[in-house]
Amino acid sequence: MRFGIPLGLVRPDAWHDLAVAADELGFDSVWLPEHLVLATGGGMQGYPGGRAPIRPSTPLYDAPVRLAALAAATRRVRLGTAVYLLGLRHPLISARAFATLDEIAGGRTVLGAGAGWYRAEWDAVGAPFAERGGRLDEAIGVLRRLWSEEAVAHGGPHFPFPEVAFEPKPPRRAVPILIGGESPAALSRAARNDGWISMPAPPERVAGAAAELRRLRAEAGREGEPFEVVAHAEGGCRPDETAAWTAAGVHTLIVRPWRRGRDALAAAERFARDHGLAPGAPSDRARPARPAS
């Protein structure tokens, strides 16, 4: 089992030290959430699965920029978004942001994407909330082409553009795209891409979704292709609980083994010790060779 750390659940001024510790302790990944804006009206709602409304004063950051800073401070740990709202932005902008991040990170980026649930963001940028799924699908297709083809023109309904060149490509000429969410549409979208990210949930609920993903991928003839299931635990994970997550089909478990954010660093150290984590060599995810330009 690989373990990840949700940086968004501690204060931003702790992200650097916690990410560096995760890198040194043997965690697999660190993850940042993403929102563009928060409404100030009385209709503010909480994160699905959460218990309290999100405060409008909550600080928000550009996730690829913050992850790039963490990439420069780490050597091995993967850097992911959970999740990034691709459909809110033109894919040329997102493609550039994540290609730049992945260049700095040496191929350690994971793009977790979602259609979104918070309508106020869409209203703020003038994008139709009802079209968020189609915009996400179209954006994903554009990103994959920009990262792999020499020149790209796109005629889709949401983001048409004339032929352009896009350089540099990401080190792998791709960035893994995982889809977050538990709706039928989200699972179907995840099955067409590189992986799935759960909401905070117990292993038995994740197991049901993972089984459905296996069915969807088998129907599409993709069961032999790489696919990552990332689950959010509802808190930590004791060593004797790991087997249940493995049986549920989880490859990477995002854990929060602390009750208070100020205890996160010490809790991560205890977690790594209890689970026998050990850092892998930085070359495990070294930058692949690229032809000279």
Language-model features: where?
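Active-site-adjacent structural elements that line small-molecule/cofactor binding pockets in enzymes
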Residues: 1-293
